[in-house]
């Protein structure tokens, strides 16, 4: 039997890690030889989740073609967000909830993408469709992913399907959604011990009308906890622009209590962000009122503005 590795995007978040583990458990129950791995360091929120449910973190890998010939992707499809040697392996399956871009295969594959708030919402359907029982531990991981991606149902990406899935998973995991959810989000929002690199850990690269754009996001309970370190943050953003040849680096600092954000933008195309949101950046900083979702409120808006 051919072994498969399953993983989410680089700079993994809670959905990416928990989806990879959950997908692997589903496929193992069906007899597959599969292992969940990760493409980067865990953030503090995900570390809290794995510790809470006593789950070992997936193994960290830099490449995959040296181990397997087939892989499955969760929570992403764009090549620049995936493993560096993705072109050297066959993608046999994708389960995702993002736009489809910069993705093609030479062979047929299982591809499932739905416009929901979280990948594990889709995975819960797959468990049920295949009549595979969701364990208490996996239910906890899947619930955590939904809470994370929907900001405890406050994000505009959240759908009724996500809410229903979360209720079902909470029953299996035997946790109270509100109390556990706030504890989890606050664990991720504590930036007091984070390095500057860790502040920018949740970053994704996009191609927008032939422009290289990187968008990082962090959830906090007080944006000043990050803005007080703005000089260090901007220095690292500038270095990333040089190292990766970026046209724009946007850092979205989201207050999970007010559901507003502040943006820091650096690069030759910062005017695009100003046009997209009708704001003016002063010393690289501007308010982004009501913006909490990179997927729904940042990527599509910037993509459309770059295309003008």
Curated annotation (Swiss-Prot):
NCBIfam families to which the protein is assigned, alphabetical: PRK05427.1 (NF003877)
Family: Belongs to the PPase class C family.
Signal peptide positions (record): none
Organism from which the protein derives: Listeria monocytogenes serovar 1/2a (strain ATCC BAA-679 / EGD-e)
The protein's name in its UniProt record: Probable manganese-dependent inorganic pyrophosphatase
Domain of life: Bacteria
Named cofactor requirement(s): Mn(2+)
Principal localisation: cytoplasm
Catalytic activity: diphosphate + H2O = 2 phosphate + H(+)
Record's subcellular location: Cytoplasm
UniProt EC number: 3.6.1.1
Example of a GO MF term: manganese ion binding
Cofactor binding remark: Binds 2 manganese ions per subunit.
InterPro entries attached to this UniProt entry: DDH_dom, DHH_sf, DHHA2, DHHA2_dom_sf, Mn-dep_inorganic_PyrPase
Keywords (A to Z) from UniProt: Cytoplasm, Hydrolase, Manganese, Metal-binding
Chain sites annotated for binding Mn(2+) 1: 9, 13, 75
Lineage: Bacteria, Bacillati, Bacillota, Bacilli, Bacillales
Broad EC category: hydrolase
Positions bound to Mn(2+) 2: 15, 75, 97, 149
Assigned GO CC terms: cytoplasm
Keyword DNA-binding among UniProt keywords: no
